[in-house]
Amino acid sequence: MHLEERVAIAAPPAAVFEAVSDWEAQSEWVAFTTVTVEPGGHRVGERLTAVTRLAGVGFADPMEVTRWEPPHRVDVRHLGRVVRGTGTLTVEPAPGGAWFAWAEDLDLPLGAVGRLGFAVIRPAFTLMLRRSLRKLARQVESRPRPRPGGTGRVR
């Protein structure tokens, strides 16, 4: 099952990549989710866990970074019982900033039952992801950035 959402962000691609790959800070903009990272820095092999919880029900989504290409792309492999597959975060330059895309290629559990279940929740999941990406864009756009010309002052 493939799912992908994109958002335009009025910030340099490097700033967008820095924000989306700050795993623990994803807890601030990914709806209903808290992310923890095992020590090791940003690199292939790094492990992290996202716990998503809504109305007291939740699941853990352990992941491993499988591709690390700053400031453009990072891939993770989902290793959990509920979520398995590949997530891809990409940042592309755009006029006035960058495009950020979050794609998931997931192997749904429980065969036909899992596919049917996801078909039911997909609209809500998509809405949650879109809102999360808009929140990310607002956060990144509101961060002070150095002025062009190297003055060190922020705008």
Locate the predicted segments by residue.
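A short, structured loop/turn motif at beta-sheet edges
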Residues: A10-A14, G41-H42, T66-P71, T90-W99
